[in-house]
Amino acid sequence: MTATPFSPPLYMQRYQFVIDYVKTYRPRKVIDFGCAECCLLKKLKFHRNGIQLLVGVDINSVVLLKRMHSLAPLVSDYLQPSDGPLTIELYQGSVMEREPCTKGFDLVTCVELIEHLELEEVERFSEVVFGYMAPGAVIVTTPNAEFNPLLPGLRGFRNYDHKFEWTRAEFQTWAHRVCREHGYSVQFTGVGEAAGHWRDVGFCTQIAVFQRNFDGVNRSMSNAEHLEPSVYRLLYRVVYPSLCDNNIYQKTLINEVLYEAQHLRQQWLIRENMNNNAHFYSPPLMEALHHGAEGNACEQQPVYQQGGIICVPLARVWSCPRVQALCGSLQRLREKLLEDERVRMSADGSALNLPADDDDDNVEEEEEEEEEENQQNVKAVSGAVNNMEEDWDRELGSYGDE
């Protein structure tokens, strides 16, 4: 018996195989059966590559409820919403059950799942996944029994809950029968390769990748199937922020525009301050400053001041790559900004109007008003507490009278 350490660990290699498949084929709807602690789902939400619906199914609701919040959006998902939508759902259910919501998926993954079924249940598994669900592709991974003698200290199956472990021939026999009965083609591969002359035993984990043969049949749910009762129990559902949501898109666009405009405003203020106090700065620094300003003026419209307003040309803001990616055209950008009350623009819509001075006085007034309001709230709460104490004393006195 030979020691066979795997680096990275075998489970990570299995997940990476699925991630690589998703990167290559970009399925929009993915469902993972036997998702347990949601490890694969967590990885796929970071490597979504076009995934719009990510679903996990497991019979163990306790584990799902414990792990489901690890799939929630991060702060960064709100600060930088993705271009495409993403919904994640977790269900308590069995791969042996015909559930209407599992139809119409592009990819089904069954990572180290099938060996936990009884042998007589495998046919039902095949019928539900390949016959009823009929996804575009299915990835099935399972232990290779021929590799077991190379695993140190192993007696019997690799896990106490495994009902069987197939040799390569047994796995391939099952897979080819599935293809004949349900119209799929299959390719075999694996992860966890033995070293040296032991390679003839195959991979430690064997993998079958099924692709449905195109037959022109629409596999989406029919109207009758929409009426079928659901047998799964929805435990968790979250919709990630994305630019497909008009409100999120508008907020993101305005934030980017204002950030860029404030940046240009600040640059202009610094430059003006240095011009007004040129005797404090070295000639090389001033020369560099004027050279940069002239270059910008030649290439783009300059920022300018009108009274107490600094005008930042919209064309300057439009030159920001992030703004261009969000808006597509300068005209569309102008239209979006004119719709938003947070943005002040020139009469002809050619520039954003920003205050020349930081409005410190208004900030102080707002802080004073907030402090006064807080003090009033404290007084109100104190009065309520005093009244409660009086009522409590009165109530105690009434009990004493009895």
From Swiss-Prot:
Annotated binding of S-adenosyl-L-methionine, by residue: D58, S94
Name of the featured protein: Small RNA 2'-O-methyltransferase
Acidic residues biased stretches: 356-374
Disruption phenotype: Defects in germ cell development due to reduced piRNAs levels.
Entry comment describing in which tissues the protein is expressed: Gonad-specific.
Subcellular location: Cytoplasm
Catalytic activity, reaction form: small RNA 3'-end nucleotide + S-adenosyl-L-methionine = small RNA 3'-end 2'-O-methylnucleotide + S-adenosyl-L-homocysteine + H(+)
A GO term for molecular function: O-methyltransferase activity
Function comment: Methyltransferase that adds a 2'-O-methyl group at the 3'-end of piRNAs, a class of 24 to 30 nucleotide RNAs that are generated by a Dicer-independent mechanism and are primarily derived from transposons and other repeated sequence elements. This probably protects the 3'-end of piRNAs from uridylation and adenylation activities and subsequent degradation. Stabilization of piRNAs is essential for oocyte development.
UniProt EC number: 2.1.1.386
Organism of derivation: Danio rerio (Zebrafish)
UniProt GO BP: oocyte development; piRNA processing; primary piRNA processing; regulation of RNA stability; RNA methylation; siRNA processing
Disordered as annotated region, ranges: 348-402
UniProt keywords, alphabetically: Cytoplasm, Differentiation, Magnesium, Metal-binding, Methyltransferase, Oogenesis, RNA-binding, RNA-mediated gene silencing, S-adenosyl-L-methionine, Transferase
Bridged cysteine pairs (disulfide): none
Family: Belongs to the methyltransferase superfamily. HEN1 family.
One GO CC term, this protein: P granule
Binding annotation for Mg(2+): E112, E115, H116, H162
Entry keyword annotation includes Disulfide bond: no
Cofactor(s) for this UniProt protein: Mg(2+)
Cofactor binding description: Binds 1 Mg(2+) ion per subunit.
Gene from which the chain derives: henmt1
